């Protein structure tokens, strides 16, 4: 059973890393429909999935193991970002990687702590509140670090990004609820993963 648990742990961490790398790539592209190019990038649609992964990890394994998944996902995500989507001659690409790493780590660890404090409330309280607060912190840290002083209208982009993240956080309650019963049914052992 421990091997299955370890496998699930690494699947969660790798999924987190993929979400981060994909989002870091997509944030470079504004949504060019319905006059949204000054308000929104495609990264806003994929990044909130990281909070779903963190919250499922926290619910299944607890706070300490969820933090391990965040750290491993962070490390892999930064590596993938630098490898696939960073143009080393472009300062903005490097700032995106640094901004993403800083915002991701800060927001996800805050999400883990808030979720843990609210875990005994009604089922949707912990994932919703922790994701909303984490998304807000992530958005403003990321956009200010990545785009401040570049001439890109990062404040407007950050508000558009946050609006979509709030919407996606609400919709992520559906898969969270669906996966919640599966996670609780399959977590009969309480042994911690030693990674």
PLM ranges: what are they?
Residues 1-64:
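Hydrophobic transmembrane alpha-helices
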Residues 9-13, 64-75, 122-129:
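Cytoplasmic-side transmembrane-helix entry/capping segments in multi-pass membrane proteins
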Residues 16-20, 47, 72-81, 102-103, ...:
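Small-residue-rich segments of transmembrane alpha-helices in multi-pass membrane proteins
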Residues 20-28, 80-88, 142, 146, ...:
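Structural signal for membrane-spanning alpha-helices in multi-pass inner-membrane proteins
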Residues 28-37, 87-92, 150-157:
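Membrane-interface helix termini and inter-helical loops of multi-pass transporters
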Residues 53-57, 82-90, 109-114:
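Membrane-helix exit/interface motif
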Residues 76-104:
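Helix-adjacent hinge/juxtasegments
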Residues 94-192:
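Membrane-embedded alpha-helical hairpins and interfacial helices in multi-pass inner-membrane proteins
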